[in-house]
């Protein structure tokens, strides 16, 4: 069962240079920043804000290094102001973007929710992402995980949002089990999950301790983007 670091996510069309390591990599693995009003370093997750882009690898260690080593000012050749806890800000913005993406996908018909519907999507091979509420009951999740692990191409697993957050995003109540159906929308959403995974675990640590089968084996989700 994958979560977030083994199957490659869809990559962007262009490459950029990480201002911390100097490595050239795909845009999908980077976060873009621009100098905002007052020279404040501003995250541009959609890559649409005007101004020269300052690109940093999408992980907490790289972003913290950029902030602490004055890399933004050096790259911009101008004095910039780094907001306090920039990594925390980016994490929150990425999560907000992921939840908004789920809402858009539901309106487009690319999501299905509820245990039976998710089970059917997994069995049919149409489930690209199995989205489970972080605070959902173990029993239903375990059954779906066991079903997913039996598929020739298991869906990836996302469990970084609770039932209330999922419900607000989808306009539903008590959202515990959701399937993101395979297609271009799931691929685009996966690109944002890739970036988010550099800042936050995609499943609660406690899930890895849950028994997932009659023989007592445990849920040990693999990362989906290594």
Tell me the role of every PLM-derived stretch.
Residues 1-70, 74, 78:
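N-terminal cysteine/histidine-rich coordination modules
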Residues 1-3, 14-20, 24, 39, ...:
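Catalytic cores of RNA-modifying enzymes
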Residues 8, 17-20, 126, 142-155:
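Short helix-coil boundary/hinge micro-motifs
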Residues 25, 61-63, 135-138, 164-165, ...:
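Conserved nucleotide-binding/hydrolysis micro-motifs of P-loop NTPases
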Residues 52-53, 108-109, 127-129, 152-156, ...:
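Short active-site oxyanion
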Residues 61-140:
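Extended interfacial segments that mediate partner engagement and assembly in macromolecular machines
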Residues 152-197:
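Short basic, glycine-rich beta-strand/loop surfaces that mediate nucleic-acid
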Residues 180-226:
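C-terminal functional extensions of proteins
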